[in-house]
């Protein structure tokens, strides 16, 4: 089995631009990338390509796809919106519109999945109304999954941890609430084929403080619905997005769980590449790629 190593390049895109970030990813040895669609992508901004219509979006992202292909880089997934619905009508409507364009850009890039965040306690408080949270979740995903279907991609909902502003578990960091929200959409025939899960190991690791499963057991319990990853490590308290094996996560158990569910996707990392400073991001990313390759080599011998 050819196991691909990927890395999220949002920070590189912000510092160096989209095209240069792809070149850097290739140079440091990545097989694949998680491509950010968040940087200056808002249809309400005249400076954004999203404000110029789908022809302009297609032209721009087609060139990026050509660049990635020429470098031998797989754009496996994109990162879309990170706020979820806030129960603020104007902002929620804008979120849907921008997600529609994210789905279109994802397809143009040749990626299979666009990762998004659900509604969060970060914006709605430490003890939000459960009915409201599930309504916001259902309303968001039921409105955006048709765009995924139209573009032949999938929307991935990302696992959560704590709500850092409040020293509380994020509402959908509670595993049972996450599953309930996921199933509410997944059980609908017209949505099920275009909805999936991204496990963020660091987020799930922070949720264990609130009696939630370990990241490995999150993977086991979600099973084959896990199709994309944000692999990162932390101390279980802070959302550090550290390189695997530099925090407290049991990585042998993570790989055991991935094997048990038959995971065959990209081993994609989402890291704080600025941990050692913005001037050291490339070196940090390169080391992370080497670490993941060595982990895979030691485990699988390939």
Which residues fall in each region the model found?
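Aromatic/hydrophobic pocket-lining residues that form π-stacking "cages" and hydrophobic walls in ligand
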Residues: 21, 64, 102, 144, ...
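Active-site-proximal loop/turn and secondary-structure-junction residues that shape catalytic pockets
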Residues: 11-13, 37-39, 81-84, 120-122, ...
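Glycine-rich, proline-tolerant flexible connector loops at the mouths of alpha/beta enzymes
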Residues: 34-63
């Amino acid at each position: 089995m050819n196991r691909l190593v990927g890395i999220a390049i949002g920070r590189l895109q912000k510092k160096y631009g989209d095209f240069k970030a792809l070149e850097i990813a290739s140079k440091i040895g990545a097989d694949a990338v998680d491509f950010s669609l968040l940087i200056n992508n808002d249809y309400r901004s005249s400076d954004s390509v999203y404000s110029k219509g789908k022809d302009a979006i297609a032209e721009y992202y087609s060139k990026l796809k050509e660049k990635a292909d020429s470098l031998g880089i797989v754009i496996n997934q994109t990162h879309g919106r990170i706020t979820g619905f806030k129960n603020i009508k104007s902002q929620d409507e804008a979120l849907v519109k921008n997600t529609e364009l994210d789905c279109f850009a994802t397809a143009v890039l040749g990626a299979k999945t666009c990762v998004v965040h659900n509604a969060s306690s970060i914006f709605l408080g430490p003890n939000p109304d459960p009915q409201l949270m599930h309504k916001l979740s259902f309303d968001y995903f039921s409105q955006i999954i048709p765009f995924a279907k139209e573009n032949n991609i999938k929307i991935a909902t990302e696992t959560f941890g704590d709500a850092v502003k409040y020293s509380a578990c994020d509402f959908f960091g509670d595993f049972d609430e996450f599953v309930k929200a996921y199933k509410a959409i997944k059980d609908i025939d017209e949505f099920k084929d275009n909805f999936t899960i991204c496990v963020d190991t660091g987020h799930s690791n922070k949720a264990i403080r609130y009696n939630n499963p370990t990241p490995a057991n999150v993977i086991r319990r979600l099973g084959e619905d896990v199709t994309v990853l944000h692999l990162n490590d932390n101390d279980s308290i802070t959302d550090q997005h550290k390189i695997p094996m530099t925090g407290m996560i049991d990585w042998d158990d993570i790989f055991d769980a991935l094997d048990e569910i038959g995971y065959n996707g990209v081993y994609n990392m989402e890291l704080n590449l600025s941990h050692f400073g913005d001037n050291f991001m490339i070196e940090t990313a390169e080391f992370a790629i080497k670490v993941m390759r060595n982990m895979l080599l030691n485990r699988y011998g390939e």
